[in-house]
UniProtKB/Swiss-Prot annotation:
Descriptive protein name: Class II hydrophobin NC2
Gene transcribed to yield this protein: NC2
SS bond list: C31-C79, C40-C70, C41-C53, C80-C91
GO annotations of cellular component type: extracellular region
One Pfam family from the record: Hydrophobin_2
Length: 97
């Protein structure tokens, strides 16, 4: 009987000492699916083409960080289908912006 009480108290102590919530480290993916390329672009032409585009200069943490990173270099955050020589075809605003 004493062994059972000691075992239960030990398990209870371990359970209470564990962290209440485990924070998951999920990487931010700004663009997915067909529009899978994250870009910072200067000019949008009716959502069909974007001009003067480049990869974001920093690793992105969230949608707001993506927007501010591109804004810091005078460009807009975009998710594009096909980047070709600084011009991107079919772009849209990233989710969360």
């Amino acid at each position: 009987m004493q062994f059972t009480i000691a075992t239960v108290l030990s398990l209870l102590t371990i359970t209470l000492a564990a962290p209440a919530a485990m924070e998951r480290q999920v990487p931010y993916t700004p663009c997915s699916g067909l529009y899978g390329t994250a870009q910072c672009c200067a000019t949008d032409v009716l959502g069909v083409a974007d001009l003067d585009c480049a990869n974001p200069p920093a690793t992105l943490a969230n949608a707001t960080h993506f927007e501010s990173t591109c804004a810091a270099i005078g460009q807009r955050a975009r998710c594009c289908v096909l980047p070709i020589l600084g011009q991107d075809i079919l772009c849209q605003t990233p989710a969360g912006l």
